[in-house]
Swiss-Prot record:
The lineage of its organism: Bacteria, Pseudomonadati, Pseudomonadota, Gammaproteobacteria, Enterobacterales. It comes from Escherichia coli. Keywords: Transposable element. This is Insertion element IS2 uncharacterized 16.4 kDa protein. It comes from the Bacteria.
Length: 143
């Protein structure tokens, strides 16, 4: 399974501790191409956390629409960033596939002029290909 990201959402009472892993995860969707090409429903492999040694339950999931990969990675935090709200807590980096969020100038050519579209620079990226990085505080819900 390529590009399948398991995301753990923090509980409300542990908003400042980024190392809390909740065991109450539910798989929401499965990539539809797995069931379409292989003829069986997607099976989530057990996820074993290396420090606490617990495994999440293996579960069969029916095929749904493909999900957008979404990950939170503190190792790729942009250090030199400006924020409207300065907070004492460390920032985290939200990353996702750049191809899902690209600006297609040919569709918006009447809104954006050609000279303006040529002056748009690519977003700050990481060493991985096709990945876009943005920084925000963990307690901010709006992008």
């Amino acid at each position: 399974m390529q590009c399948l990201t398991i995301t753990a959402v923090q509980r409300e009472r542990d908003t400042q501790s980024l190392s809390v892993i909740t065991a109450e995860l539910e798989p929401v969707r499965a990539p539809s191409l797995i069931a379409f090409f292989h003829g069986h429903s997607a099976c989530m492999c057990p996820f074993r956390w290396r420090y606490s040694r617990f495994s999440l339950k293996q579960q069969r999931i029916l095929a749904h629409d493909p999900v957008n990969t979404f990950g939170i990675d503190r190792r790729h935090t942009i250090k030199f960033c400006l924020s409207a709200k300065q907070r004492p807590y460390p920032t985290i980096t939200i990353r996702w596939q750049l191809s899902d969020n690209m600006v297609y100038t040919e569709k918006h050519i009447r809104i954006i002029s050609v000279t303006t579209a040529a002056a748009i620079h690519p977003v700050i990226g990481s060493s991985e290909n096709d990945v876009q990085l943005r920084t925000r505080h963990p307690e901010t819900t709006a992008d």
